[in-house]
């Protein structure tokens, strides 16, 4: 940001608010995407989000990170994100008969018949779905799938898959939800549980195990004079800068170099002007375009950085030119 100090500081809080939160959520969501190993992951987190705007931005950030869609209808309307949803436990409980609840739901939502089958007993409910399916088929309604939301999901999925297959519903998919995060997703995928897709809520939309990101916005130059903080534990590098990214011969990320603006380094420059005098220099990219770019960049992470635990830190280097500038600034302040 290059601007008079009052203007630069007027936008500081909102820029930090948007970047901190969505970067944090997108990072958490990307870990779930990697753990799911190609199986769709859906945002179910609005009810546990820290406020309405946070829920909407979490839906956006998770979609950018690779989620298949969201259960937040307003996010779908605002951002063009695919909307997913099933039925509620309350709908089942409002009926005196579980099978009747399933049938009424199918009649009301004939194009999205995904039954929530854990209100009482999953295996019993799965058999009710099998018994109901021929009657629905006679009315051109197909069972799209079932959702499991509690208990030992791997064990329940195997038992339910067996019941559905024996009942002729081999095409019905199993969606799993219930306190999922990247670690549980990884365990379920590694166990080869017959689960086709996942819904992730609380852990993602609150980034429960890493609920903050200490991103900062600091003055680096004033009236052409480079400057920096030297506060203990909070020192910054001075001057306008550029970041260059280098890849391995195999196309994977190798390292970044942070340097002064005019110190050309090997690799691709990452910082580009987006606005001038308050006007965008180009149209904002479409959300799906951003999502594709994120997928490309995630695919370039080396295996050592794709691990859920004991992940290797990315190599970020400070150029000699930037170190020399910092020394010069320190001598004069």
Where are these regions (language model features)?
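Buried, small/hydrophobic-residue-enriched core segments of structured protein domains
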Residues: 1-167, 183-184
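Generic beta-strand/beta-sheet core signal
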Residues: 86, 116-118, 148-151, 175-177, ...
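Gly/Ser/Thr/Ala-enriched C-terminal appendages of enzymes
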Residues: 162-167, 172, 180-333
């Amino acid at each position: 940001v290059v601007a008079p100090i009052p203007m630069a500081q007027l936008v500081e809080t909102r820029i930090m608010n948007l970047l901190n939160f969505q970067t944090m959520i997108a990072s958490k969501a990307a870990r779930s995407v990697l753990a799911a190993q190609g199986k769709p992951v859906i945002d179910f987190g609005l009810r546990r989000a820290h406020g309405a705007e946070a829920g909407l931005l979490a839906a956006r950030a998770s979609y950018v990170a690779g989620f298949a869609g969201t259960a937040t209808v307003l996010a779908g309307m605002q951002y063009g994100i695919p909307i997913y949803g099933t039925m509620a436990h309350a709908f089942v409980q409002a009926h005196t008969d579980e099978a009747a609840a399933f049938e009424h739901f199918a009649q009301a939502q004939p194009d999205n018949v995904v039954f929530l089958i854990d209100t009482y007993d999953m295996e019993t409910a799965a058999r009710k779905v099998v018994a109901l399916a021929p009657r629905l088929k006679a009315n051109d309604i197909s069972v799209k799938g079932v959702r499991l939301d509690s208990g030992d999901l791997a064990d329940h999925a195997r038992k339910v898959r067996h019941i559905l297959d024996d009942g002729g519903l081999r095409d019905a998919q199993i969606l799993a939800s219930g306190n999922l995060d990247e670690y549980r997703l990884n365990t379920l995928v590694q166990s080869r549980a017959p689960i086709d897709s996942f819904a992730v809520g609380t852990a993602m939309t609150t980034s429960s195990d890493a609920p903050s990101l200490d991103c900062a916005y600091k003055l680096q130059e004033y009236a052409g004079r480079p400057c920096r903080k030297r506060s203990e534990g909070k020192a910054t590098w001075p001057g306008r800068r550029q970041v260059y990214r280098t890849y391995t011969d195999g196309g994977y990320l190798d390292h970044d170099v942070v340097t002064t603006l005019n110190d050309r380094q090997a690799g691709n420059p990452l910082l580009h002007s987006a606005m001038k005098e308050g006007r965008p220099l180009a149209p904002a990219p479409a959300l799906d375009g951003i999502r594709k770019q994120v997928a490309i960049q995630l695919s370039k992470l080396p295996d050592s950085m794709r691990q859920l635990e004991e992940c290797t830190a990315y190599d970020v280097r400070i150029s000699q030119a930037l170190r020399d500038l910092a020394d010069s600034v320190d001598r004069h302040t």
